[in-house]
């Protein structure tokens, strides 16, 4: 339902289109936040999610009541160019949004899906300038995407039968991952300078029998340690220090950072500061950039922005053996058998063969981050099945 015309052109909309999520803020002419969209993963379907978001905004506020729709974020520039609307660089947007929430903020820790950055702000009365900026390189170490991947690999929620990729499923996995890590009393030593070495470190710790909660906490502690050593380096951070971005929702990551910065602040709207900043900038410039849904549908965003997709692979000529344990086979008293066990980072397999290379028994199960415990269960399973 549209609002009355007397309230027309009252709202400025800011949308942060990141590598992982969409975040949206709506402000009124008094710079007050009137709406924040829930944190939403786009799974590469940016065009569809933007269309759904704009449709919802038009329905909620009325198309004619919106003065400006503006974009920021890693995918925001192409969208703005296609639609002919305002765009602001995400670093400036993040600072503007953070300063609106905490006007005296001096240091801004930003951690998103693919980027981590440090922004230091110098204040001169009512004015400010970006004193220094430092960001990660092309490696995904320390980013939200890498933590998502490790959560999916380690969290017990992954081993439910329902393995669909959805917002709810990933939220469930991350919640399980974080809650388990919060139980740790002593973080394991995980090197987080490189994603490859980090994963290798974690697998090695699993194989040593380290508690899973200690590995998870160690990952977050290592993440904070790597940020301090590589991004902060020898700089002294001025207070207040503000933590924003998708990873600022992660209670375990906040805990790890507070070991270095006890007064660290996670503000309200912490995942939407970029969206807030670009909405404020557009309002300040008195921009009047809008579009209708027809323009959005004609923009053909899919070809330029959405993640490229190929046809699903199909195994047409490959025969896969049954992954379930073989049927019980009783062994003769003097049968010599040979057991091979493959303990991987995600699955554990064994095969039992006789002297003629015939398969006697096999099994394939998820490692679940507990290689020793799972291997013990498999050995017990052999005894129960074969009476060996």
Where do the model's predicted regions map?
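Acidic, glycine/GT-rich loop-and beta-edge segments that sit at the periphery of enzyme/chaperone cores
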Residues: 2, 165, 284-337
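Short glycine-rich, Thr/Ser-proximal phosphate-binding strand/loop in the N-terminal lobe
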Residues: 9-52, 129-137, 341-382
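Short beta-strand-loop/turn "lid" adjacent to the catalytic site in phosphate-handling enzymes
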Residues: 38-42, 58-91, 116-120, 209, ...
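Glycine-rich phosphate-binding loop plus the immediately following alpha-helix
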Residues: 45, 129-182, 194, 199, ...
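Glycine-rich phosphate-binding loops at beta-strand->alpha-helix junctions
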Residues: 74-76, 222, 231-260, 269-274
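Adenine-nucleotide phosphate-binding core of ATP-dependent small-molecule kinases
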Residues: 198-229
């Amino acid at each position: 339902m549209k609002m009355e015309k007397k309230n027309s052109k009252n709202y400025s909309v800011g949308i942060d289109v990141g590598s992982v999520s969409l975040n949206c803020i709506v402000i009124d002419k008094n710079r007050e936040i009137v709406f924040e969209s829930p944190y939403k993963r786009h799974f590469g379907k940016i065009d569809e999610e933007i269309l759904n978001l704009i449709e919802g905004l038009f329905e909620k506020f009325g198309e004619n009541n919106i003065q400006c729709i503006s974009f920021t974020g890693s995918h925001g520039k192409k969208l703005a160019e296609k639609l002919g609307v305002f765009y602001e660089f995400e670093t400036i947007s993040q600072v503007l949004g953070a300063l609106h929430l905490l006007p005296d903020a001096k240091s801004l820790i930003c951690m998103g899906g693919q980027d981590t950055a440090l922004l230091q702000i110098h204040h001169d009365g009512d004015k400010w300038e970006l004193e220094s900026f430092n960001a990660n390189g092309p490696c995904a170490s320390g980013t939200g995407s890498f933590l998502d991947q490790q959560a999916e690999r380690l969290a017990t929620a992954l081993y439910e039968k329902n393995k669909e990729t959805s917002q709810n499923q990933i939220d469930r996995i991350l919640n399980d991952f974080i809650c388990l890590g919060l139980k740790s009393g002593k973080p394991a030593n995980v090197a987080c300078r490189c994603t490859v070495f980090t994963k290798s470190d974690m697998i090695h710790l699993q194989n040593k029998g380290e508690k899973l909660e200690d590995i998870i906490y160690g990952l977050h502690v290592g993440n904070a340690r790597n940020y301090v050593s590589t991004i902060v380096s020898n700089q002294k951070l001025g207070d207040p220090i503000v933590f924003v971005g998708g990873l600022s929702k992660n209670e375990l990551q906040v805990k790890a950072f507070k070991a270095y910065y006890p007064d660290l602040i996670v503000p309200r709207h912490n995942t939407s500061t970029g969206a807030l900043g670009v909405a404020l900038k557009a309002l300040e410039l008195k921009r009047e950039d809008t579009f209708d849904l027809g323009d959005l549908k004609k923009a053909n965003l899919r070809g330029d922005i959405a993640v490229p997709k190929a046809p699903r692979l199909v195994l047409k000529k490959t025969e896969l053996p049954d992954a379930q344990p073989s049927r019980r086979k009783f062994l003769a008293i003097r049968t010599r058998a040979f057991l091979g066990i493959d303990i991987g980072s995600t699955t554990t397999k064994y095969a039992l063969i006789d002297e003629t290379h015939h398969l006697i028994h096999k099994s394939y199960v998820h490692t679940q981050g507990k290689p020793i415990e799972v291997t013990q269960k498999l050995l017990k399973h052999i005894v129960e099945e074969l009476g060996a």
